[in-house]
Amino acid sequence: MKEFIIKANKAVTNGEINLKDLPGSSGRLDLLCRCVNSAFFLSHDMRRDTIFYSVNYGSPNPPVALKFVGSELKRVSPDERSIALFIKKALEKDASELWKESTSGIYSSKREFRDIILEKKNEGKRIFYLHLNGKPLEDFEFKNQDDEDFLFVLGDHIGIGDEDEEFLEEIGAEKISLSPLELHADHCIILVHNILDRLK
């Protein structure tokens, strides 16, 4: 199982989303939509072995975590507007500590970025922090996905911040670099999928 989590520093935390202004008034929700696209959509299929989390820290009521489960997703199209509509529905729910399903395979909860990562760590998942200054990808050995589960941690255009970087170091997350160049989060997801696809 492959799981991804992004800290969305400015992404809105209620359903008041302007679909005509995802990058601006919605707090770079366009970035989040592109990550969902990269996490799940193939040319004529969807990835069922993937879960994607976004933890939104924008106004008015942060944090709100969103969870997308590939094996359950239905009716979502790959374009940003369609994905944003489903995110809007999820954010219209009153978030609590329990995951609430808004539409098939999409959930919201009142959870912190670190809490989800710790939960995955306690489940035995191997945690990777994708960062420009991490160890080169070729220095890591990945087992077959049937033998090992992964969580990949991503930052948005702002990053995750020093405190969360220290937290990841404390829990033993492995810092990995996919490229000598700084990449967009959605591009990183595609590269990770490509690497793990080749292990099947």
Curated annotation (Swiss-Prot):
* GO CC annotations on file: cytoplasm
Organism from which the protein derives: Methanococcus maripaludis (strain DSM 14266 / JCM 13030 / NBRC 101832 / S2 / LL)
- A matching Pfam family: Methyltrn_RNA_2
Main enzyme class: transferase
Give the protein's recorded name.
Answer: tRNA (pseudouridine(54)-N(1))-methyltransferase
Give the reaction(s) catalysed. pseudouridine(54) in tRNA + S-adenosyl-L-methionine = N(1)-methylpseudouridine(54) in tRNA + S-adenosyl-L-homocysteine + H(+)
Q: What is this enzyme's EC?
A: 2.1.1.257
Localization in the cell: Cytoplasm
